[in-house]
Amino acid sequence: MVKLRLKRCGKKQRAVYRIVAIDVRSRREGRDLRKVGFYDPIKNQTYLNIPVILNFLEQGAQPTGTVQDISKKAGFFMDL
């Protein structure tokens, strides 16, 4: 099963996150299938590759709660 979840990047005390499609059995920093977005909580910036995310959702991927909240703030999950 594939999930859309956050992968931590950046420095200590300066975390940024990539939104990735990853196998459920992989750890947080494990090998991802594809990078589908970016989230910076300090600068409050979000980038979502919407066509790729829709493709993974159609194939049965499940977003985690945090990724779903970030997507709602960006206005993406309003229609779904």
Swiss-Prot record:
The keyword Chloroplast applies. Belongs to the bacterial ribosomal protein bS16 family. Induction: Transcribed and spliced in green leaves. GO terms for molecular function: structural constituent of ribosome. It is found in: Plastid, Chloroplast. Its main location: plastid. PROSITE patterns: RIBOSOMAL_S16 (PS00732). Pfam families: Ribosomal_S16. One of its GO terms (biological process) is mitochondrial translation. This is Small ribosomal subunit protein bS16c. Disulfide bonds: none annotated. GO terms for cellular component: chloroplast; mitochondrion; small ribosomal subunit. Keywords: Chloroplast, Plastid, Ribonucleoprotein, Ribosomal protein.
